[in-house]
């Protein structure tokens, strides 16, 4: 059943406990990074995330900073990851805990009421195909992070493969893939043929500081990155990028300009981070 929706964007995703380069636990998951993209929104915007109540204290600073923009729902567990950056383009990642699943009950609890949704799965099981179909039936335009296609739901060193359900694709309006995810999905070079086979109207393939390819209606356009930021760890850059893209699309901005604005936001936010070694790419 279609719901009465307002122009705007809602981000849905699991909270995550991150351990980056052996440092103490830090807030992770899209909810921890996307809010900076939504704070100056001219359209309705909010984030709904899930995590175990025992872990909510780690995310209190986010609630204090962003207030009503962020809402946290209780779940039986919290996603957890370890990330070790090797250099600006490479990192090792492992899964310490698989997070909760967003089903019908969780969608009803979140009750998104905006035309656009940014779904931010950390692993393949976060948003099942039935959930995506339910959201599409409500009338939402879904922007989906490709992590949910390639990341297997198992504890240990992160396993990525292309064994995802094809039923995940039809409900999507936009699919965002990092370069390495695109290679996995395509089983080789990602090109117009791959984009046509997937059947998603808009596909973004990001290349970090090298920019972003936009696949729409059988064509591809490369949008350069705003500027390069070296010497920082870039966890969450993809979350900020996709949230900003979805926000601007919900406001009527076209794909190319939305990518430009998202790239500018990410570069500006990365410049605020302390320089350190080793560094990596999100």
Task: Label each residue range with its predicted role.
Residues 2-5, 159, 163-166, 189-282:
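Conserved phosphate-binding/catalytic region of the ribokinase-like
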Residues 35-44, 248-251:
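Alpha-helix C-terminal capping segments
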Residues 48-50, 145, 206:
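Generic beta-sheet signal
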Residues 116, 120-193, 211:
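Conserved beta-alpha-beta core of the PfkB/ribokinase-like small-molecule kinase fold
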Residues 2-8, 16-25, 40-121, 125, ...:
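Conserved N-terminal subdomain of the carbohydrate kinase-like
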Residues 26-30:
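Conserved alpha-helical elements of sugar-nucleotide-dependent glycosyltransferases
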Residues 13-15, 240:
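Active-site metal-binding loops of divalent metal-dependent hydrolases
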Residues 36, 81-83, 211-215:
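Short beta-strand scaffold segments in enzyme catalytic cores
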């Amino acid at each position: 059943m279609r719901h009465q929706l307002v122009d705007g964007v809602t981000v849905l995703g699991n909270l995550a406990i991150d351990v980056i380069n052996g440092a103490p636990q830090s807030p992770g998951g899209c909810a921890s990074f996307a809010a900076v993209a939504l704070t100056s929104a001219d359209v309705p915007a909010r984030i709904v995330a899930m995590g175990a109540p025992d872990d909510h204290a780690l995310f209190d600073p986010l609630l204090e900073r962003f207030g009503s923009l962020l809402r946290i729902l209780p779940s039986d567990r919290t996603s957890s990851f370890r990330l070790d950056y090797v250099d600006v383009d490479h990192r090792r990642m492992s899964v310490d805990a698989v997070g909760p699943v967003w089903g019908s009950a969780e969608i009803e609890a979140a009750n998104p009421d905006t035309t656009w949704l940014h779904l931010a799965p950390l692993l393949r099981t976060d948003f099942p195909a039935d959930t995506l179909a339910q959201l599409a039936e409500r009338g939402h335009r879904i922007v989906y992070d490709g992590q949910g296609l390639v990341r297997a739901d198992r504890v240990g060193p992160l396993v990525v493969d292309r064994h995802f359900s094809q039923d995940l694709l039809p409900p999507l309006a936009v699919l965002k893939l990092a370069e390495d995810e695109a290679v996995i999905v395509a089983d080789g070079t990602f090109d117009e043929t791959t984009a046509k086979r997937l059947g998603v109207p808009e596909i973004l393939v990001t290349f970090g500081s090298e920019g972003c390819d936009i696949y729409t209606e059988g064509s591809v356009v490369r949008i350069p990155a705003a500027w390069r930021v070296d010497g920082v760890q870039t966890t969450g850059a993809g979350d900020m990028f996709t949230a900003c893209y979805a926000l601007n699309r919900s406001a009527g901005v076209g794909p190319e300009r939305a990518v430009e604005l998202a790239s500018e936001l990410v570069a500006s936010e990365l410049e605020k981070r302390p320089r350190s070694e080793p560094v990596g790419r999100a």
